[in-house]
C-alpha cells in the first residue's frame, strides 16, 4: 500500500489540472498563434510560467486504483501488476489465468 500522502498529493494535482485546464489551453493558444504580436505572446508565456507547476497534466502520476502503487500500472485497467495478479488468482478478472510451465 502506498503512502496516503503520496496518493493525496496526486489527487490534488488531478484537481489542479482540471481547474486550470481551460486557462492553460487559452494561454498556449495565444503562445502558438504566430499572428499575435511578440509582446502579447511573451506576456502569455510569462503568465503560463507563473501558474503552479502542479497544474500541468504531465505532473500527474498513473497510480493503481487498488493499492496506490506508482510503478508498473496498466493503463487499461488502472491496476498495478501485483493487484492484477492478486485479483486474477482469486478469479475476479474474467479470462485471466495464471500461467505455469
From Swiss-Prot:
Keywords associated with the record: Ribonucleoprotein, Ribosomal protein, RNA-binding, rRNA-binding
Family note: Belongs to the universal ribosomal protein uS14 family.
Function: Binds 16S rRNA, required for the assembly of 30S particles and may also be responsible for determining the conformation of the 16S rRNA at the A site.
Residue ranges, annotated region (Disordered): 1-22
Ranges of compositional bias, category Basic residues: 12-22
InterPro entries: Ribosomal_uS14, Ribosomal_uS14_bac/plastid
Bias (Basic and acidic residues): 1-11
Origin: domain of life: Bacteria
One example of a Gene Ontology biological process annotation: translation
A GO cellular component entry from the record: small ribosomal subunit
Subunit details: Part of the 30S ribosomal subunit. Contacts proteins S3 and S10.
Gene behind the chain: rpsN
The organism's taxonomic lineage, starting at the top: Bacteria, Pseudomonadati, Pseudomonadota, Alphaproteobacteria, Hyphomicrobiales
Gene Ontology MF terms in the entry: rRNA binding; structural constituent of ribosome
Coiled-coil features, chain-numbered ranges: none
Name recorded for this polypeptide: Small ribosomal subunit protein uS14
Species, as recorded: Afipia carboxidovorans (strain ATCC 49405 / DSM 1227 / KCTC 32145 / OM5)
Family matches, as Pfam families: Ribosomal_S14
Amino acid at each position: 500500500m502506498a503512502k496516503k500522502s503520496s496518493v493525496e498529493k496526486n489527487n490534488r494535482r488531478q484537481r489542479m489540472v482540471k481547474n486550470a485546464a481551460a486557462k492553460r489551453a487559452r494561454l498556449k493558444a495565444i503562445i502558438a498563434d504566430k499572428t499575435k504580436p511578440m509582446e502579447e505572446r511573451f506576456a502569455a508565456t510569462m503568465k503560463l510560467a507563473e501558474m503552479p507547476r502542479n497544474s500541468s497534466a504531465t505532473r500527474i502520476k498513473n497510480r493503481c486504483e487498488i493499492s496506490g502503487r506508482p510503478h508498473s500500472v496498466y493503463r487499461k485497467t488502472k491496476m498495478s501488476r501485483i493487484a492484477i495478479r492478486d485479483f486474477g488468482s482469486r478469479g475476479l478478472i474474467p479470462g485471466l489465468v495464471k500461467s505455469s510451465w
